[in-house]
Amino acid sequence: MASGNARIGKPAPDFKATAVVDGAFKEVKLSDYKGKYVVLFFYPLDFTFVCPTEIIAFSNRAEDFHKLGCEVLGVSVDSQFTHLAWINTPRKEGGLGPLNIPLLADVTRRLSEDYGVLKTDEGIAYRGLFIIDGKGVLRQITVNDLPVGRSVDEALRLVQAFQYTDEHGEGPCFASP
C-alpha cells in the first residue's frame, strides 16, 4: 500500500480528475466543493462483485448526504469510458444503471497514491473512505481490505458527528445517523 499524503487534521490532497456526472464527462476538482463536506471513497475496479453494492448504496442515499451539505464522490483506477459503460449497463445485467453520484477516473493512479490506498502490486485501490470538511481538511480515514465494503449509515453518522463538533465542540458518541 502506498504511504500517501493524506493526514488527519491536514489539508486533503488536492485532485483534478475526469468524472462521469449524470451520464456525461466532466472535470472535477476538490476545490469545486469548497464550503461543503466531501465523502471520497475508493473502490478497486468497475464490473466487480462488491463494488456495485457499495456504489449503488451511496447513490441511493445521495440526497441524505446533500441535506447535510455533503457531496459523495467515488473513485477507481478505471477510465471514464469504463465508468460510463458500467453506468450504461442495467443493474440486472451486472451494471450500475443511472447514478446520483460522480465516479472519478484515476487512470494515472495519482489520487490512489496521494490518498495512500494504492495496492501497488495489483495497481488497484483498496476500499478507502475519506471525509473532508468544508475547509478542505481531512477529518476521517478508513481503509478496508478488498473483500469488505463500507457502511453508508456509518459514513452519514460520521459526517453528522463532525458537523456537530464543528459547531458545538466535543460531543457524545453519536450512536446513529
Curated annotation (Swiss-Prot):
Report the SUPFAM superfamilies cross-referenced here: Thioredoxin-like
The record places domain Thioredoxin at 6-164
- Which CDD domains does this one have? PRX_Typ2cys
Post-translational events = The enzyme can be inactivated by further oxidation of the cysteine sulfenic acid (C(P)-SOH) to sulphinic acid (C(P)-SO2H) instead of its condensation to a disulfide bond. It can be reactivated by forming a transient disulfide bond with sulfiredoxin SRXN1, which reduces the cysteine sulfinic acid in an ATP- and Mg-dependent manner. Acetylation increases resistance to transition to high molecular-mass complexes. Deacetylated by HDAC6 which decreases reducing activity.
Classify the source by domain of life.
Eukaryota
InterPro entries hit by this protein: AhpC/TSA, Peroxiredoxin, Peroxiredoxin_AhpC-typ, Thioredoxin-like_sf, Thioredoxin_domain
Q: Which UniProt keywords apply?
A: Acetylation, Antioxidant, Cytoplasm, Disulfide bond, Oxidoreductase, Peroxidase, Phosphoprotein, Redox-active center
Supply one GO BP term.
regulation of apoptotic process
Gene3D superfamilies recorded:
Glutaredoxin
EC number of the protein: 1.11.1.24
List, in alphabetical order, the Gene Ontology terms for molecular function in this entry. Answer: thioredoxin peroxidase activity
Assembly: Homodimer; disulfide-linked, upon oxidation. 5 homodimers assemble to form a ring-like decamer. Interacts with TIPIN.
What the protein does comes down to:
Thiol-specific peroxidase that catalyzes the reduction of hydrogen peroxide and organic hydroperoxides to water and alcohols, respectively. Plays a role in cell protection against oxidative stress by detoxifying peroxides and as sensor of hydrogen peroxide-mediated signaling events. Might participate in the signaling cascades of growth factors and tumor necrosis factor-alpha by regulating the intracellular concentrations of H(2)O(2).
Its family remark reads: Belongs to the peroxiredoxin family. AhpC/Prx1 subfamily.
Instruction: Please identify the protein, giving its name as recorded.
Output: Peroxiredoxin-2
Write down the species: Pongo abelii
